[in-house]
């Protein structure tokens, strides 16, 4: 075996160091590696309680007993928007919110000293664990991410012990007032996980509710949209991109990553007649049907976009190089056009109302007229839907609860 002298070894180490520094400058930023979850740590909690602004847990603190004025936690998410935590002594004139918008931390603050909304720091919606700390120092609020100070707000607060209302509430994953009361509204529900959290001064804590999140954070995830069996999202057709007028045309695209079971994938209809036009999964085939007439099918191929194109005379189902067309009878055109004319016209994703469906599936996206739809913006959706993540293994997400 060839041996290297001290000089050669030193040169090799110097070369490796220079290469590392070079890649760091080119964007391979060095990040602190957070330790993995220990068996002694409490389990991570999921931050979403479903649609709406309901928090998963609420804690109350006696500010007259506060000696520690900082809170810290680790958060992991693929979701670019939502509330991490909210705090107040009075929801009308003294409140604070830390959330994400476009993947980056955002602080909203309203009190006697300041009213502001400010975003700062790196994107946190990359599916990794990030350490976050919020501190109060005198009249300042500090935000640290992964050990680095990313924001310092001066002259925005007084001492906690001088608050007119000496009881502070902290809510996780939601708000204690309507989302419209925020200075800059956002979608409160955050599809993310939180662990190793420490809130203010434990000695000053008066009460704490048990977390009510619907999902376990033990499952490794990838970005996407996951619908467990029997779940659905419902969009008003007037709230999504509209059909092309001349000639009339409308398209839907599904990026299927995982699929199992049998049942509906999507449908166009009304609450009274939800399946005027539908796609459902059966025997590893995607079946297109219109009303009670004959349908057509394509073999299920995961990873290729599944596209549905509607025109005045036919519906085309395609995936990759395979394509089939379903002719529409002349009498079928009026109900199709009426779906967009009626306020109750709907796009259903997943199980139909009242359907006993065993289908579970993961999408890397859902598009109408080429524009991505956000499940958080659905008219209604099941609480159990994973709005921005999918289990890495198909079987792991079917039991989504703790």
Swiss-Prot record:
Disulfide bonds join 193-217, 362-390. Keywords: Disulfide bond, Glycoprotein, Lipid-binding, Repeat, Secreted, Signal, Steroid-binding. The keyword Cell membrane does not apply. GO terms for molecular function: androgen binding; steroid binding. SUPFAM superfamilies: Concanavalin A-like lectins/glucanases (SSF49899). The keyword RNA-binding does not apply. Glycans are attached at residues 36, 380, 396. Residues 1-29 form the signal peptide. Isoform 1 and isoform 2 are present in liver and testis. GO terms for cellular component: extracellular exosome; extracellular region. CDD domains: LamG. SMART domains: LamG (SM00282). Changing residue 356 to N: Generates a N-glycosylation site. Functions as an androgen transport protein, but may also be involved in receptor mediated processes. Each dimer binds one molecule of steroid. Specific for 5-alpha-dihydrotestosterone, testosterone, and 17-beta-estradiol. Regulates the plasma metabolic clearance rate of steroid hormones by controlling their plasma concentration. This is Sex hormone-binding globulin. It comes from Homo sapiens (Human). The gene is SHBG.
